């Protein structure tokens, strides 16, 4: 798309506004103005389609668009003259009236020729080309799925590479606010010009946080010209402030060389094989990290570096600027009012003053605008006063942003604001498991799950976090452990900025802003006094006994341990956290970690929620100290190691109050241990994405309190034991993507409280006749080709909904 196309669209819009004014105020031009108004309004959707299509038109059609641009430009100047003409100057009014009639004829004649036929043909070609690219994505994903099928789920680098390549091929549609402004189009043109005029090299996109650097980079990744130039060989990686450089180097090596990412990475030169490749490195913080990631000498390789700092040569760097005043007002109004202009009757000066306080920064405009949505003018005045007083001594945009973001939190109630600040406990550029977040809010703020979810949605609506799009989100029986939220770096900086105020021992949240090799020095310098923090978040690499020092947390209720290593010594001070309710242990390394000093769990008598991710689950025995108040346990990407298989093991003695057990993506789980059926307090059991699970225990009927049973995406599971039909309280059964299952248990009709069955992508050939007795059933999700099996049940059970779902394959679980 040429820049001319964009301005043609803008001028058409302005011309329409002026023609509307003329048609209602200037009687001599009224009829002509109305005709022009109808004419231009009819072609504006077509101009808009061309404007945003991304198609680079041939030269002769560019010339024709240029002619239209000139005509509309003349029309705008003419309407300016009409609106400024005096009523007593009859000669000038008659002259202008004739010119308007001539303008109407010119545009009308222009539309009668074949120009728009040709242009619409180009739009048609774009659609056809998009269809081809979607087919290519489908075929590429099929290849990725085949690769994943031959790998272990915890396999590390090669799977991460597959995930990143799938991300690089992803086609998305963002909302209007993400693609806002002429600046984005100009930025794309300038960056493409830099990259296309070279045979490779390192180029940069720089600018302050929240200005739209990543948005521009993602638009370039999806740009048709860029994809054609690099023949879809594009890798997009997020580096972050505390990167795992060696893993990233392996991913880049695998992408450029075609070898497996796990292979050694030699520093050597390679001959040019004619294949151009693009590596986009987002959120790079240091020159050292950039040098390490661009040390390969591959001819034809282009690297695009996205950073808040200028890390590349000035002549090869595009500086993303803030929005112009008009663009800023339009974006602000879109977020505050749901439209791109100030509504009639609302104080224009007030809107402009508040928007101007955001200094053209897109993120500040979006967050501040969303926070004012639906608020009265007096509230706006109060916000304006607070913003105007927030100018820091340092006049940089970064400093102003944090103060403006803080003002955006003023209309949140204290609990919602606290929940926002809790987000600073998670590492940057990592997806936050929704289940972990909800559990923390429930335990820390004494709210129930429904209120926690409402706060989540509220923060999302105010653009203070990004909630992943998932059709299950918010449904009654939805699982949250494989749904994620994300947060922009600047918003995380705000949470850290507010949480880290004051003396370190007096903070409610003790947080590490980024990954470090050791604990922060000021923590050790102040460890002679206890810490009052309720949330403690530690983000390190491998930790041994000597790296920990003594600390006291008498009020700590939440502990989050993020690390990247294959072995990890748990901090000894956990044993003194007598109030600890939630423990989250996440290994971001490439293989499961062995945890040492698990014996300290014996002192966690109040622990209610335990999340273990990518670790070896310790062996359980009858001598294991019971966790008497543990209600929820999640084992994600873990090695189970037959932890529950000890002869005579009474799991109920160890976890007497466990109500929710999740085992997800654990590739060494072959059979569900029968000892788990001793957990008579269990109300929710989720065994999901376990590729080797082939057998369920025969004594499932012992789980008399069970209400939710999820068994989805277990491809080796061939049968469901009949004992499932002896679960009197079961309300939800999910067996979707269990492709080896061929039937439901014959006596499923005994489940008198069963409300919902999800059986997508199951190869069923029949349905049990007893299903007509499922009088509480209200929702069945199945494939289109088996929906007919439920017609008889649909007639027998009033209010039953049979939903024929489309097949959906996802690699989202690989995203981290």
Swiss-Prot record:
Q: Where does ATP bind?
A: 207-214
Q: Which UniProt keywords apply?
A: ATP-binding, Coiled coil, Leucine-rich repeat, Nucleotide-binding, Plant defense, Repeat
Which is an annotated GO molecular function term of this record? ADP binding
User: Signal peptide: which range, if any?
Assistant: none
The chain's coiled-coil residues are 95-111, 399-415
Q: Does the keyword Nucleotide-binding apply?
A: yes
Q: Where are the LRR repeats?
A: 681-704, 705-727, 729-751, 753-774
Any idea where the NB-ARC domain is? 191-443
Q: The RPW8 domain covers which part of the protein? A: 1-149
Check the record and name the SUPFAM superfamilies matching this protein: L domain-like, P-loop containing nucleoside triphosphate hydrolases
* Pfam families from the UniProt entry: LRR_Zer-1, NB-ARC, RPW8
* One of the record's GO cellular component terms: apoplast
Q: Which BP terms from GO are recorded? A: defense response to bacterium
> Keyword Membrane: yes or no?
no
Task: Present the record's domain note.
Answer: The LRR repeats probably act as specificity determinant of pathogen recognition.
Query: Which protein family is named in the record?
Result: Belongs to the disease resistance NB-LRR family.
What role does this protein play? Probable disease resistance protein.
Which protein is depicted? Probable disease resistance protein At4g33300
């Amino acid at each position: 798309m040429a820049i001319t196309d964009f301005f043609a669209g803008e001028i058409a819009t302005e011309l329409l506004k002026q023609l509307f004014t003329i048609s209602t105020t200037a009687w001599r031009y009224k009829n002509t103005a109305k005709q022009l108004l109808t004419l231009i309004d009819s072609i504006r959707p077509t101009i808009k389609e061309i404007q945003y299509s991304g198609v680079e038109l041939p030269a002769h059609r560019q010339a024709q668009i240029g002619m239209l641009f000139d005509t509309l430009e003349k029309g705008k100047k003419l309407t300016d003259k009409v609106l400024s003409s005096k009523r007593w100057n009859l000669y000038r009014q008659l002259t202008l009236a004739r010119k308007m009639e001539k303008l109407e004829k010119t545009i009308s004649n222009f539309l009668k020729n074949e120009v728009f036929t040709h242009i619409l043909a180009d739009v048609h070609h774009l659609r056809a080309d998009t269809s081809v690219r979607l087919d290519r994505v489908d075929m590429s994903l099929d290849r990725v799925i085949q690769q994943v099928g031959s790998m272990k789920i915890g396999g590390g680098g090669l799977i991460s590479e597959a995930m990143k390549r799938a991300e690089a091929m992803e086609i998305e549609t963002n909302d209007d606010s993400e693609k806002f402004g002429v600046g984005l189009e100009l930025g794309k043109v300038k960056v493409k010009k830099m990259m296309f005029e070279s045979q490779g090299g390192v180029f940069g996109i720089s600018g302050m946080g929240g200005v739209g650097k990543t948005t521009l980079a993602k638009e370039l990744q999806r740009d048709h010209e860029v994809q054609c130039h690099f023949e879809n060989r594009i890798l997009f990686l997020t580096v972050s402030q505390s990167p795992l450089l060696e893993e990233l180097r392996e991913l880049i090596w695998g992408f450029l060389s075609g070898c497996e990412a796990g292979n050694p990475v030699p520093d050597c030169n390679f001959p040019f094989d004619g294949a151009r490749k693009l590596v986009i490195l987002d959120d790079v913080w240091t020159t050292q990290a950039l040098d390490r990631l661009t040390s390969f000498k591959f001819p034809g390789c282009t690297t695009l570096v996205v950073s808040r700092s200028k890390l590349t040569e000035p002549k090869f760097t595009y500086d993303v600027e803030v929005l112009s005043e008009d663009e800023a007002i339009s974006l602000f109004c879109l977020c505050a009012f749901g439209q791109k202009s100030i509504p009639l009757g609302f104080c224009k000066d007030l809107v402009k003053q508040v928007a101007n306080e955001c200094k053209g920064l897109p993120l500040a405009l979006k967050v501040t605008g969303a926070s004012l949505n639906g608020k009265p003018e007096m509230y706006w005045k109060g916000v304006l006063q607070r913003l105007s007083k927030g100018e820091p001594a340092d006049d940089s945009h970064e400093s102003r942003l944090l103060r403006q973001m803080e003002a955006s939190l003023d209309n949140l109630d204290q609990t919602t604001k606290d929940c926002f600040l809790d987000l600073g406990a998670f590492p940057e550029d990592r997806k936050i498991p929704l289940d972990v977040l909800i559990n923390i809010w429930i335990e820390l703020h004494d709210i129930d799950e429904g209120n926690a979810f409402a706060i989540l949605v509220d923060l999302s609506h105010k653009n203070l976090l990004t909630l992943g799009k998932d059709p299950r989100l918010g449904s009654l029986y939805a699982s949250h452990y494989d749904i994620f939220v994300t947060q922009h770096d600047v918003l995380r900086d705000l949470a850290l900025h507010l949480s880290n105020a004051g003396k370190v021992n007096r903070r409610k949240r003790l947080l590490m802003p980024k990954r470090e090799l050791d604990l922060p020095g000021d923590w050790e310098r102040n460890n002679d006094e206890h810490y009052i923090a309720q949330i403690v978040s530690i983000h390190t690499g491998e930790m041994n006994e000597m790296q920990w020092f003594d600390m006291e947390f008498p009020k700590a209720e939440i502990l989050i341990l993020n690390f990247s290593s294959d072995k990890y010594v748990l901090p000894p001070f956990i044993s003194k956290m007598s109030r600890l309710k939630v423990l989250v242990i996440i290994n971001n390394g490439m293989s499961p970690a062995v945890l040492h000093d698990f014996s300290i769990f014996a002192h966690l008598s109040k622990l209610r929620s335990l999340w273990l991710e990518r670790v070896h689950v310790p062996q359980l025995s009858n001598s294991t100290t019971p966790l008497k108040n543990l209600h929820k346990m999640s084992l994600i990407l873990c090695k189970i190691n037959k932890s529950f298989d000890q002869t005579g093991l009474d799991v109920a003695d160890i976890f007497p109050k466990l109500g929710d057990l999740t085992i997800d993506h654990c590739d060494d789980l072959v059979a569900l241990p029968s000892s788990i059926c001793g957990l008579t307090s269990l109300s929710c059991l989720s065994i999901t994405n376990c590729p080797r699970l082939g057998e369920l225990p025969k004594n499932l009927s012992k789980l008399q309190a069970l209400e939710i049973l999820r068994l989805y995406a277990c491809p080796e599971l061939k049968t469901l034991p009949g004992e499932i039909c002896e679960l009197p309280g079961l309300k939800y059964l999910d067996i979707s993507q269990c492709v080896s299952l061929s039937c439901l248990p014959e006596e499923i009709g005994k489940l008198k409280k069963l409300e919902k069955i999800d059986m997508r992508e199951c190869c069923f050939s029949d349905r049990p006749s007893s299903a007509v007795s499922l009088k509480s059933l209200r929702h069945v999700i199945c494939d289109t080709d088996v929906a007919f099996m439920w017609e008889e049940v649909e007639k027998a059970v009033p209010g039953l909904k049979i939903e024929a779902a489309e097949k959906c394959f996802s690699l989202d679980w690989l995203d981290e």
